Amino acid sequence: MSLLGLAAIQTAAEAGGNFDLVEREIRSVAKRFPWVSMVAIGELAIHGSSIDLAEPAGGPTEQRLSQLAKETGLWIIPGSLYESRDGKIFNTTPIIDSAGDIVARYDKLFPFLPYEKNVSSGSDYVVFDAPGGAKVGVVICYDVWFPEIIRTLCALGAEVILVPTMTNTIDRDVELAIARANAAISQCYVVAINVAGEQGVGRSAVYGPGGECIHEAGAGREILALELDMQQVRNARERGWHGLGQVLKSFRDMPVAFPMHESVAARQKAMKNLGALEMPGPIQHDRPPTDAATEPKPKLTIIKKKGPA
């Protein structure tokens, strides 16, 4: 049996520091759920979304997280942190094992442009061996909108995809639909961990390898402690979910190539007519501007109501 005991912690993130709260939540998981071997939290949940709080790799936040991992015996996936390296800032997820070692770093491939305009894109995919024989991949928030990433991670062996997220906008419903679809089309677990409080609307969710919703959280603080069975992933990929579509095999065996994906240049050429990726400006109306002095005034109709006789 290949089980991963995972706790997804939906913290109440504030614009300032949340590290003390995060640490209490992690220590609580270690006491309440002794079968859990890994905890994960939402994107930027520890320090918030200001790049002014970026630290160098191996800085004080990572050091404190490493010590916490050693003390609790848990693998810690601390959402993400803004990290400064080589004169650039990355939105980074350090993967910390139960001995407190950083076994990998994942840099967000798709910063949420144009809003994360000063954050550099990563270049590497990360899949790591986790307790229970699971293979786990990581993406960050907006990355999940690009199914090519999820399928690449699964081609590298991933059976669980962690998606730390910080979303406080109206598109959370869309994000959940995308996460669910990715679970189904790549036949894997998808754990979409949002933050609550000032900087997130919550609604973290876990989907199984058939796209089934295992649990969706509410809007407030919550801990989603689950046993994820890797055999279910392997069965779905081998036999199809409940004996239905064997999606990855079909994708593998299809003899047709995707021209747009042959190179970066081919992709850029295919979508060159979309215009620049920039902040949307004011909404422009079709009605031409007029001079206020000459613009006709709207006709005003007044109806006088007679009083009682």
Give the residues covered by each predicted segment.
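Extreme N-terminal starter segment of soluble prokaryotic enzymes
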Residues: 1-6
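C-terminal beta-strand edge segments of enzyme domains
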Residues: 127, 195-309
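CN hydrolase (nitrilase-like) catalytic-core segments centered on the catalytic cysteine
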Residues: 57-75, 145-224
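Active-site catalytic loop in hydrolytic enzyme cores
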Residues: 63, 84-159, 165, 169-177, ...
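Cys-nucleophile CN-hydrolase/nitrilase-fold catalytic domain and related Cys-dependent amidase chemistry
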Residues: 13-105, 169-184
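Hydrophobic/aromatic beta-strand patches that form the interior of the parallel beta-sheet core
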Residues: 7-9, 40, 77, 104, ...
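Eukaryotic scaffold repeat domains enriched in small/polar residues
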Residues: 18-20, 29, 71, 122, ...
